[in-house]
Amino acid sequence: MNGMDYIQQILNDDDINILLQKSNQTYHLQSICINNSNFTSSEIELSCRLAFLLIGLSFHENTNPKWAEYAYKLLKNIHIKENEDREIFDKIMGYELDNVSLIYYFYLSSLALILDKTISARLDLKQFVDFEDVESSWSQRVLAGIFKALFFLIRKSDGFEDIRRAISEISNLQKEQVKFEDQYLNQFDVQTQKEEALILVGLYHTSKALTETAEYLINGYNYKKRIDNVVRQHIDIALDLIPSDVRLRDFISIINKDLQSLIRHSIWNGTAFQDQIKKLCEFKSSHNILELLPSQRQAMQQNLFDVYANASIVQMPTSAGKTMLAEFNIVLTKSLRKDAKVVYVVPSRALVNQVYFDLRKDLSAIGFNVERTSSASEIDPTEADFLIADDVDVIVSTPEKLDLLIRRSHPSVEDVSLFIIDEAHTIEN
C-alpha cells in the first residue's frame, strides 16, 4: 500500500468520515452566517490532528485537491480565540511561537489561496488580532513578523495601505535587528551560534521575498525585475541555509507558494500586452482593485480576448467580475480600430444606469466616451444627436431600445464592431 492509499484509508474510517461531513455542514452554515459550531474537545483534537496530516500533503505536487479542502474546513471548526481550542491547537500544531494564532491563520489563509478562495482568505484574516511584542526571542520575533507581513499582503483590506503595512513590518524588523540579533546569538555556544545565525539569515531572505512581492504589487508594470524569479531565488537560499528544521522549512515552502499565488492573482499579471489595458489596470489599482478574481483569470486563460472569434460566451455568477472583462474587450476592440463602436446590452433600465456609471468611471480615465439610451419608447431628438456623435465609443442600452434603433436603421447601430450582451439568456423573454 502506497502513502496515498494509506491516507485514503484513514479518510474512509467511519469516525473520520462523520467528522468530515460535520465540518462540511458547519462550513456551509457559517457561509450564510449561521454559527452552529458544537464540536466536542475530542472532535477539536481529531480535527487538529487530521488537518495537520492533510496540510503536510496539500502543498506537494500531484496531491488530491480534496485534501486541502478537507484541511481548510477542519481548521474552520477551531475557534482559535477560545482558550480550550487554542490549547489543543498549540499542543498538536504549535511551533516555537508564543502567539499560536499566527500559525493558525497562516495555515488557514495558505489553504484558502491554494484552493483559489482569495476572498475567503481575506475575510478569514480580518479575524486576526495582532499582539504587539509577544514573542520572547529574536528568531521568534522575525518569524512572527514574516507571518504578519504575509497576512497584510493576502488581506489587502485597505488596498495599498495593507501592502505598505507589510513593508513596514519587515522594515521594523530590520531596525530591531541591530538591537536584538547579537544579544540573541551570544547566549549560545559557538556551534549552536553558527546554526542559529544561518537560520536567521534564511529568515531574512524569506522576509526579502515578501518585501519584493510587496514592491511588485505596489509598482506594477514599473517593477523592472522578474518577480517570480526574485522570490524563488530568496526562498531557495533560505531553504539551503535551514537544512535541519523540517517544520521551519515547511513554513518557508508554503510562504513561497503563497507569494507565487499573490503574483499570479495580481492585476499586473498577464495584462501588460496592450497599453490601454495597462492604463485601465493602473486606474483600477488606484481604486484598490489589486487582483483578478478566480473567474476573471479563468476567462482570460480560455482565450476570451481572441480578436478573431465571432462570438465568446462567458458564464459567471453575479459579482464575479464580468464588467471588468467587458472593459478589457472594449479596450482591445478600440485598439484594433480607433473609430470602433461598442454596444453594451443589459436586460433592464436600472442596469443601464448602473453599467453606464461603472463604464464611464473606468473608461473615461483612458479617454473613452460612454453614452446610454433613454428610457423613452421612442427616439427623441436630443438622444438622436448624442448617439450619432463621432466621439461616442460605447452605447449602453436595453434590448428593447436596441431593437427600436435597429428597426429604424438608426446611424448609431449601423457600424458596430462589438456587441456585449449581459444576461443573454433572458433576451428571448
Language-model regions: role of each:
Residues 1-429:
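N-terminal helicase ATP-binding lobe
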